[in-house]
Amino acid sequence: MGKDKTLPLLDPREPPELTGTKSASKVWAKEFGEESKRLWELAGPAIFTAISQYSLGALTQTFSGRLGELELAAVSVENSVISGLAFGVMLGMGSALETLCGQAYGAGQIRMMGIYMQRSWVILFTTALFLLPVYIWAPPILSFFGEAPHISKAAGKFALWMIPQLFAYAANFPIQKFLQSQRKVLVMAWISGVVLVIHAVFSWLFILYFKWGLVGAAITLNTSWWLIVIGQLLYILITKSDGAWTGFSMLAFRDLYGFVKLSLASALMLCLEFWYLMVLVVVTGLLPNPLIPVDAISICMNIEGWTAMISIGFNAAISVRVSNELGAGNAALAKFSVIVVSITSTLIGIVCMIVVLATKDSFPYLFTSSEAVAAETTRIAVLLGFTVLLNSLQPVLSGVAVGAGWQALVAYVNIACYYIIGLPAGLVLGFTLDLGVQGIWGGMVAGICLQTLILIGIIYFTNWNKEAEQAESRVQRWGGTAQE
């Protein structure tokens, strides 16, 4: 297949086995350190990119909150429900490129990566057209799910103005996966960081100084996402991405069926995870006197969202490492990368959990001045800490699945663990046994725990040599060569 062993971060050596001898332990520790360095070179910029892009919506909500309660509610609902739906679907559909581009890069089929990205554009822009009705008819959709009429109307109006962001998602995620698979994560980090600064300035200028209100918020958020797209695209067009970009090609329209299947599996896998904790907030709203529990859960989800940025960075890093090494035929190194990143992310999760538990009496006051809300948040902080720990490892295991191309399998696991076991258990504990928000969250955490254990089992019993062979077959079946 013309594999290039000089590709960055690819290493043809076999990883050491931990035999128990002192010398073997030293070698294993040395290799662990080297692999950790490779992972952090990818994860560090990826974490910064995730935080920067997450902050775009958070900053818009912050500035909109200065306009009034209705404006804040409109932006919050649109961001979390309408754009949240689109973000999850688009990110999931684009994640197929993590498998294909990563394995093509490892296999030395660099020129096929640009073709894969164009195929993903075709699929994601088509998907965006199918998602348009959600934006156009947002008010009745939100009202159907119980949102107050005046908030539904305001959020629906804001959703119409945010349609350009939908198509920015369609352009952005394939580009990001294309660059990420080549470990060009520093480029993404620089562009996202610069755009975040511009976004903060423009938000103040258009929302507050010029008093354009929600129109200014929409203009700023749309512009920021398109600046990210344009910046990354200019980098690719100017540098040719080390030969991975050879120009637009009609090959992008070939073999779309298999590509669509993998994209749909990726979207289903990710959306089932992405929406699971969102369901927690919705179900909590069905409790008697839900105002305080919903506020407490929202504070906890805010904390969990920020800590999740670390896991997302490691998700990207391990997806690249596994797909690259499998594509290069280095099955043992792919397995070793999984071990290293699992240990690293779990240790970080333990630290984050300790911080949450140690500050459970004080961090709620960063978000509220209500004693009742703060007390409820403190009461459920133990569940937050455990969720933070689980979610330090679970996205990493999902990243392994994406790198290996197991999206369809993990989607079935997610359906079973989250929606057949976790959610019903939460409903029984919360409503039937009258345990309230603690019961709802406890049941859903049980689903996450079960899913994590199943993924660990799948990874442990995986035949990595067979996965490397399947990666080679996948690259040949969905690409061949870019010259044909």
Curated annotation (Swiss-Prot):
GO cellular component: membrane; nucleus; plant-type vacuole
Localization of this protein: Membrane
Name the UniProt record assigns to this protein: Protein DETOXIFICATION 33
Residue runs in coiled coils: none
Family: Belongs to the multi antimicrobial extrusion (MATE) (TC 2.A.66.1) family.
CDD domains: MATE_eukaryotic
Chief location bin: membrane
Topology relative to the membrane: Multi-pass membrane protein
GO molecular function (one): xenobiotic transmembrane transporter activity
Keywords from the UniProt entry: Membrane, Transmembrane, Transmembrane helix, Transport
Residue ranges, compositional bias (Basic and acidic residues): 1-16
Transmembrane segments: 39-59, 81-101, 122-142, 155-175, 190-210, 218-238, 267-287, 294-314, 338-358, 380-400, 409-429, 439-459
Renumbered residue ranges of the record's region Disordered: 1-22
Phylogenetic lineage: Eukaryota, Viridiplantae, Streptophyta, Embryophyta, Tracheophyta
GO biological process: xenobiotic detoxification by transmembrane export across the plasma membrane
NCBIfam families (alphabetical): matE (TIGR00797)
UniProt xrefs under Pfam families: MatE (PF01554)
Cross-referenced InterPro entries: MATE_euk (IPR045069), MATE_fam (IPR002528)
